Amino acid sequence: MKYISLHNKDRIYTFLKKDVSLHIYPIGDLDDFFWPFTNWYGLVDNGQLREVVLLYFGQSSPTLLALSRNTALLHALLEKIKPLLPPSFYAHLSPNVQAVLEDTHSLTHHGKHQKMTLAEGSTLPEAEKDEVQRISAAESGAVKIFYRTSYPGNWFDPRMLESGQYAGIKKGGDFISIAGVHVYSPTYNVAALGNIATHPQYRDQGLATKVTAYLCRSLLREVGTIGLNVKVDNKPAIACYKKLGFVRVAEYDEYTIRKK
């Protein structure tokens, strides 16, 4: 088996769509909105594509997405592309795959996470009229202020407001709860929720459930699969998502990785 660089969207998508729930993020990154920030590598055996990983450069730090149900193949691919990896990057890795990098890299573990997707036929609660509003790109400044207090250290890309798929609740002119997307692609029929947070003073009032439900209803008009990532020890968030109809589909680990 050998590795190759992949440049054909159709070939990548044909492979990834075999397990949409696991690969919502990389599938969404095939969209023209994200594609310029991507590098793709594949493991090939007798001309057949056996595994795919993605390096995404759309954030301040590159992010490696290396997720698979077949960790042996994923291990083999990562072993081959190790010399091509940047000196420092963030990573989403299937369980135990990190072992292939431990001899050449220093790894800082950021916890076990799980992937969840919204089950078909889920009943999403309706918010009161005008309680939740769609957030425009013009409100980027107010959104950044909200996240500094409510979700410090989060991965917020202001470009994502251009998708029109951010929703929030305001009080006194300021946001007190927001739900958004990390990935959104009607072309590839997927969306990944992200940056869901409530101001500390307004938690435990069901606001995150309201904004997330509103956003899911909006997204379901455009895409067929909605997913999200959440830390396994974030019990309140998981309870909120289960209430809305999300189900667990996989576990993975997040790391900051640097060459030794």
Protein language model annotation of sequence segments:
Residues 108-119, 247-260:
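Conserved catalytic-core motifs of GNAT/GCN5-like acyltransferases
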Residues 1, 20, 27-81, 179-194:
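Conserved donor-binding loop and adjoining core beta-sheet/short helix segment
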Residues 1-24, 120-154:
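Short amphipathic alpha-helix that is part of the acyltransferase structural core
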Residues 91-98, 228-238, 254-260:
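Conserved beta-strand-loop-alpha-helix junction that forms the acyl-donor binding cleft
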Residues 56-128:
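Acyl-donor-binding surface of acyltransferase catalytic domains
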Residues 101-102, 240-241, 246:
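Conserved active-site tyrosine of GNAT-family acetyltransferases
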